[in-house]
């Protein structure tokens, strides 16, 4: 089995190392990820400048490939250039920060990378871990983040995908892990309508010219309450006639995941 691991937090993220460790016993792994932080740009692809690839050594001493472009570029280059054949699974993550709701479907790079793999017929899994503050992802390596549960679940779900494939009608999975779950039960959910209320912060540069920070605060929303108690495994909504069928197939697939664990 061959597993391609990528992310949008960058090749030096602690989360991508945790992802590799979680699945290294399941098959041959290769990390191909963007050289720099690419969060929030969705399914972006580099079209108007060359994309360069460098071999790098991660902080745990393992090797990886750093791509000068986006996570989407990394998936394409990994599948069609760096690997001899298509991988059996692509894992995107482990992302610092949850990816919930329909808005995240179009803005999340973690989901975008998994989606790109699915476009090319490769089963994929996006994994995101809730963190205390949204800015933690920008201080990776300086703030301790406990990936243990997210890594354990990544390995469990990845093993299920490799053994049984994805459920009928499902192209990829999006797994969200709360920072302090009430249990390790995995629940199937639907995508919510919105994740956060948008806040725009206006500031002035030294020359008096305005600039803006776009921010979101999930505190107090149903997403925050939901993520604080249970693990979430969900899929983007397929076209309406097939939505219930895919949900049923995923629920049955999850039952097999629980039986396999026991």
UniProtKB/Swiss-Prot annotation:
Pfam families the UniProt entry points to: SurE
Subcellular location: Cytoplasm
Cofactor: a divalent metal cation
Keywords assigned by UniProt, alphabetized: Cytoplasm, Hydrolase, Metal-binding, Nucleotide-binding
SUPFAM superfamilies recorded: SurE-like
Cofactor note: Binds 1 divalent metal cation per subunit.
Any one GO MF annotation of this record: nucleotide binding
Gene3D superfamilies (UniProt xref): Survival protein SurE-like phosphatase/nucleotidase
Domain of life: Archaea
Keyword Metal-binding included in the entry's annotation: yes
Enzyme class name: hydrolase
Entry binding sites for a divalent metal cation: 8-9, 39, 95
Matching InterPro entries: SurE (IPR030048), SurE-like_Pase/nucleotidase (IPR002828), SurE-like_sf (IPR036523)
Role summary: Nucleotidase that shows phosphatase activity on nucleoside 5'-monophosphates.
Family annotation (HAMAP family): SurE
Family: Belongs to the SurE nucleotidase family.
Annotated protein name in UniProt: 5'-nucleotidase SurE
Protein source organism: Methanothermobacter thermautotrophicus (strain ATCC 29096 / DSM 1053 / JCM 10044 / NBRC 100330 / Delta H)
């Amino acid at each position: 089995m061959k597993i391609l691991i990528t992310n949008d937090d960058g090749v030096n993220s602690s989360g991508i190392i945790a992802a590799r460790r979680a699945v290294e016993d399941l098959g041959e792994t290769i990390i191909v990820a963007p050289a720099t932080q690419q969060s929030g740009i969705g399914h972006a692809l580099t079209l108007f400048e060359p994309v360069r690839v460098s071999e790098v050594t991660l902080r745990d001493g393992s090797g990886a490939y750093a791509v000068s472009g986006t996570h989407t570029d990394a998936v394409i280059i990994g599948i069609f250039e760096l690997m001899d054949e298509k991988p059996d699974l692509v894992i995107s993550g482990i992302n610092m920060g949850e990816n919930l709701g329909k808005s995240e479907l179009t803005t999340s790079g973690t989901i975008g990378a998994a989606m790109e793999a699915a476009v090319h017929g490769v089963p994929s899994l996006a994994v995101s871990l809730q963190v205390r503050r949204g800015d933690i992802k920008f201080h990776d390596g300086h703030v301790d983040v406990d990936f243990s549960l997210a890594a354990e679940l990544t390995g469990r779900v990845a093993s299920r995908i490799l053994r049984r494939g994805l459920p009928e009608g499902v192209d990829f999975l999006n797994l969200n892990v709360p920072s302090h779950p009430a249990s390790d039960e995995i629940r199937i959910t639907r995508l919510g309508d919105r994740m956060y209320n948008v806040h725009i912060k206006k500031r002035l540069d030294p020359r008096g010219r305005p600039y803006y920070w776009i921010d979101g605060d999930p505190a107090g929303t149903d997403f925050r309450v939901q993520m604080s108690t249970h693990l979430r495994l969900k899929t983007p909504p397929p076209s309406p006639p097939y939505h219930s069928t895919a949900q049923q197939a995923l629920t049955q697939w999850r039952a097999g995941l629980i039986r396999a664990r026991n």
